[in-house]
Amino acid sequence: MSSRYVDTTAIMQVIGCVYNTPQLLDFTDKYTITDEDFPDEFHRIAFGAIYKIYELGAENITLENISDFLSSRPKSAASFKQNKGEEWLLKISDAAIPSAFDYYYNRLKKMTLLRAYDNYGVDVSYIYDPDNILDVKKKQAQEDWLDNATLEDIATKVDNTIEAIRMKF
């Protein structure tokens, strides 16, 4: 079951920036990127290849590195090829905005948290409802709140809602 809580732009920006500057992965105290941040297998493969190649000592990541790395992983290589991975990586690396990496990283992590709640059956549409296209004011208010909220703010809001339900019954 795919989740509604996916920000494809954030995913592309994060992968594009890390592809261009894999040294971002060195800041483990600031950035923690995991498989859970990528609900789509193709994105997990692309990011995973970049991550492993850098972890294995490459200072720069190239399409050739990725192709070589995936060549010993036929299933991943097939998915990467089917999704035109090389073309996609070139496109997102050109579109990557390094100065906005923190924004997109935080957006990625917020979607991961909302997706985790959603996957466990917790309705978080009162925080962010990506399916709302009719109530423009509500949509903007939710976007504004989400942009300004931390992961802790989101977790606290969900915890408070669950606690209110617990106290009611």
Label each region the model flagged:
Residues 1-113:
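Noncatalytic partner-interaction/assembly domains of nucleic-acid and motor enzyme complexes
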Residues 93-169:
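Interdomain "pre-motor" coupling segment immediately N-terminal to P-loop NTPase/helicase cores
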